[in-house]
From Swiss-Prot:
CDD domains: FGGY_EcGK_like. This is Glycerol kinase. Belongs to the FGGY kinase family. Coiled coil: none annotated. The lineage of its organism: Bacteria, Pseudomonadati, Pseudomonadota, Gammaproteobacteria, Pseudomonadales. It comes from the Bacteria. It comes from Pseudomonas fluorescens (strain ATCC BAA-477 / NRRL B-23932 / Pf-5). Glycerol binds at residues 87-88, 139, 243-244. GO terms for biological process: glycerol catabolic process; glycerol metabolic process; glycerol-3-phosphate metabolic process. Sn-glycerol 3-phosphate binds at residues 17, 87-88, 139, 243. The gene is glpK.
Amino acid sequence: MTDIQNKNYIIALDQGTTSSRAIIFDRDANVVCTAQREFAQHYPQAGWVEHDPMEIFATQSAVMVEALAQAGLHHDQVAAIGITNQRETTVVWDKNTGRPIYNAIVWQCRRSTEICQQLKRDGLEDYIRETTGLVTDPYFSGTKLKWILDNVEGSRERARNGELLFGTIDSWLIWKFTGGKTHVTDYTNASRTMLFNIHTLEWDAKMLEVLDIPREMLPEVKSSSEIYGRTKSGIAIGGIAGDQQAALFGQMCVEPGQAKNTYGTGCFLLMNTGDKAVKSQHGMLTTIACGPSGEVAYALEGAVFNGGSTVQWLRDELKIINDAHDTEYFAGKVKDSNGVYLVPAFTGLGAPYWDPYARGALFGLTRGVRVDHIIRAALESIAYQTRDVLDAMQQDSGERLKALRVDGGAVANNFLMQFQADILGTQVERPQMRETTALGAAYLAGLACGFWGSLEELRGKAVIEREFEPQLAEAEKEGLYAGWKKAVSRTRDWEPHDEAK
């Protein structure tokens, strides 16, 4: 480890759903340089989404080379690589040629819906929830992998003979970067496959049997922070975490009760529950996160379907704003929403309601309502939905929320951040560093190779740019929230369907 002093940089590879990025960090965890390339999305049928794994690897290697060149660095100056990735996306490749036998099936792809329905008919929902922490949904890797083995001729037999390998995107990239020497994944990615027992920390024999998946094709599961292998040019690969778990670590949410919300198109909330794998009563996922040194910790995860997309709707469909950034100005022009609530259930409601038949609605309209009130109500809806999820997580875990760390595009909106603190009655902390996902991967790699000595050293680098303190009186806060709950109840079960009462 002696030469680590001469290596002053860490590279984070952030392999996302639409682009591959490389971000170089220095010893102070500042961004030195970033490179990014988009790649093609393939939609062979309605509801199907695929990526070309070779293109993912090509763009990911290209941006790494590009970032080094841009920063004027040689690979000898890099201490380690950390990888963070779009989760659940499924790749199967030939061990000898290193080529995929089918395109990657992406997390958004719904083609394995029928396989999930069969699992439900077979009464496996409770077993899946207990063992893997997940709901029975095409979102997760297991049913995607079964689909490939069912539909690519001879593939199951070849997998049994040890000729084919399965991996999520992290595994695929590491296999390619190490020239086929290393077939691994980490606990956070394994916990998204629906094939992994999150309590024993082993591949689950019953799930493999039910989905008819040969054990031979699965990667070895390791911690999120250790040296897994080296690239052909000799750089150590030292950190792996799925994107949401990497963001949780990048935000330094390593103690029970610490939570982060990523405000994107939807919102992704994760709350650390320490060494307790909490079974949710509210439809949250129980998932594996990173403990203080990349070891296994548990978290609850909940998703809000419509966050930033609600603001896009104001802009693109209603055309009442020109730019998402304008919402802060309009929301601040009025003292409140004038009794208006917008429930953005455009695609149903996610956690904790799980109602696919709910539809969006505006409530409380009177003649005094102006566009400003509607814009304000749209921003408020993002904060209300976040509270819905965090209240459920606190009930499930028995942990009190200490503070909410935030990242993602919408955190630049000061009105939204202040209202979020107000409606939660909890401090909201916005970090200076917005690249929290890549930072998490860099931290994990840096800890593995001794680039950074300890968690305490990293905590010193987590600069909070602004803290938003709650300013609403308790009675006012609860009055507003009661109005939201009433509005949500009126949107439920709107769309006609077979199971309707």
